[in-house]
Amino acid sequence: GALGHDAAITPDPFDAATARRLMAEAGFPDGFALTLHGPNDRYVNDAEIAQALAQMWARIGVRTAVATMPSTLFFARAPRDENSISLTGWSSSTGEADTSLINMVATPTPERGWGTVIRASHYSNPETDALLERALATIDNDERGAAYRRIVGIGVQRDLAVIPIHHQVNV
């Protein structure tokens, strides 16, 4: 796997009862409404994935309107922060995790170039930022890999800054 890959990470099972309980504990016993924005021509079955998410979220009280559009329109909205929640994808042309992690779980910091183009979320956590700084400052692959795994453990697994749902393989 890629540097920082953690084979021990497995998807959480869908558990509507627990999700409804957690929503109530968070102050949303009757759920809430949002719009899921996404492209309809960028990823395999992207519009269908958005519809499936809306149907699953409805089971826990999240009333979801789906707004899919051509990717040229969708991606133009992101820098203006016009999307409520987005179906989007990330990859790395270098095989390194830094670019993806900077855009998914780093605090937007223009002077560092972090999160200045497209943000996957409004997530901000000093702990993931410090780990990312450490990973970017070393050439020790073991140290970088450990930092990447910890960043994903905090920002993705624990805090759900992003929710990975689909891995597209291109050939």
Where are these regions (language model features)?
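Append "and occasionally in soluble cytosolic enzymes with long acidic Gly/Pro-rich linkers
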Residues: 1-55, 59, 122-131, 139, ...
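Solvent-exposed loop/turn segments at secondary-structure junctions
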Residues: 2, 40-44, 71-73, 91-95, ...
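Extracytoplasmic/peripheral linker and loop segments enriched in polar/acidic and small residues
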Residues: 7, 21, 59-79, 102-171
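N-terminal secretory/targeting leader peptides
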Residues: 37, 54, 82, 100-101
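Short, solvent-exposed loop/turn and secondary-structure capping segments
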Residues: 46-50, 97-101, 164
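Long, His/Glu/Asp-enriched segments that create or flank divalent metal/ion-associated functional microenvironments
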Residues: 53-58, 65-67, 87-89
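Paired acidic/hydrophobic, glycine-rich loop segments that form the ligand-binding mouth/hinge
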Residues: 84-89, 164
